[in-house]
Amino acid sequence: MQTNLSQLIKVARGETEADLVLLNARVINVFNAEIEQANVAVFDGKIAGVGDYRHGKEVIDLKGAYLLPGLINGHTHVESSMLDIAQYARAVVSHGTLALITDLHEISNVCGKEGIDYVLDASADLPLSIFLQVPSCVPATHLETAGAEINSQDVADLLRLPNVTGLGEMMNFPGVLFGVPSVLDKIIAAAGKVLDGHAPGLSGKDLNAYISAGIHSDHECIHLAEAKEKLARGMYIMIREGSSEKNLAELLPLVTDQTYKRCLFVVDDRSCADLKSDGDIDAVVRKAIRLGLDPVRAIQLASINTAEYFHLQGHGAIAPGYLANMIVCQNLEQLDIDMVFHKGKLVAEKGQALFKPQSRIPKSLLNSIHIRPFDTKDLILKTIQPQIPVIEVIPGQIVTRRLDLKIPAENGVIKANTELDLLKIVVMERHHQSGNMGHGLIRGFGLKKGAIASSVAHDSHNVVAVGTNDADLYTAIKELERINGGIALAVDGQVTASVSLPVAGLLSTKPLEEVVTELEEINNQVAKLGCKLSAPFATLSFMALPVIPELRLTDLGLVDVKTFKLIPQET
């Protein structure tokens, strides 16, 4: 160790040759927001110096290309890609993401700590630094049934692991506000660490109370005024642009010379199709630049700001002593990535990963769909109420609206009405064979025929299905049982397409390209049935999440998120 440090110092002083020298670079300096003409010397995976360096075991002339720090995704759920961690790395490293922060609450809601162990173990040899925010909400709330639990003692144990930065998004904001002991115990266990928030729409004294508990950030802002209030009260604002959650255009005016250090870019949830076609955090940077943000400022929000918020020493900049995680591109505004270096090693070029990761998936994670036997009669929606609460989807957002509509019933039975775009939605418990099943109506999917189903249903990941009739709902759900989890489409009693996600019912075992092709096929079929949503299965996956306003459906029933209570259903 001392020998390497001594050699690093000698390389920095120009007394001995570097492992790698990058000549004639236009270096993006994230500390002073300037672009510097310089050479960069690398030794033992670190940057030795920026300046006049010419002697190295390997020398690459960049001929005036831009050299950027590796990008950092400050908040993402890798499971939303539907890829196992090895294939996920292939997808994002080629787009310049060399570090990320995730809380893995998707897979841990199904498999507990075993799911976390799988991701951390499988990522150990990848050219991608994964930092963990310990899941704070497994289960997310008492209003649904999860497959596992991570309690305050588990949180304390996980916080001692390497590469753990703090406590993941505290979604149970009512639990914070009402002082629920089990919630507060987790916050206390993470004292001194970074505590991420999740507080959609919270303001005034409730916001003060939430922040006073020690929570530092929020990524759920959808309106500029909301983001301004939270920033003014001391929060870091994670500006999100994912596959279903698109908040960048609305929130970008928040970034000024006075506020930019309190802002960072995140994707939260991004599909493998979007990762392949558009990219990861680089896509957010490109869009921010198109919307008028200065390119260097945009890079700061995807590198040094994130590193400093999470206290990631050695990440986020091209400077002496920092990790040699670097990106080469010709056009800063287009961010067309030519080369990606991880610790000084070329790991991707022209959009192609140069490494071949090996998947290491425990067999115990491959059997997670446990549904009590059911038939179409169990899917019937009955009511004697004059008005029915209906979930309304908002395109491009994961928040929903509550509609209370008069729906005609036949002998107390409510059926879907495709002319009014009123479809049936069902959530079925799939971890313990309890038989729990929630029923409701939803508007916004636009299906004219058939049904879609998914075992990806944030955050407890029970089975969620939307359809025009009970027979197709039944067929789609039974297909999920057959393939050990995934997504499915059924029309006229037949399965017309499905994508198997056997790892915890969330992730595929197939290569990136195959998964993307399968997803494109099923999405195209859904579109032909009348659905106008750009990402129907991504949207479907959030309909059972009872911590995002206004109305949700879990296996226990309809949830009014404003009151954080189940809505009684009189039948």
Swiss-Prot record:
Keyword Manganese assigned: yes
Cofactor(s) in the UniProt record: Mn(2+)
Family (UniProt): Belongs to the metallo-dependent hydrolases superfamily. Adenine deaminase family.
Catalytic activity: adenine + H2O + H(+) = hypoxanthine + NH4(+)
EC number: 3.5.4.2
Top-level division of the source organism's lineage: Bacteria
SUPFAM superfamilies in alphabetical order: Composite domain of metallo-dependent hydrolases (SSF51338), Metallo-dependent hydrolases (SSF51556)
Listed transmembrane segments: none
GO-annotated biological processes: adenine catabolic process
Name by which UniProt lists this protein: Adenine deaminase
Keywords: Hydrolase, Manganese
A GO MF label: adenine deaminase activity
Record NCBIfam families: ade
Origin species: Dehalococcoides mccartyi (strain CBDB1)
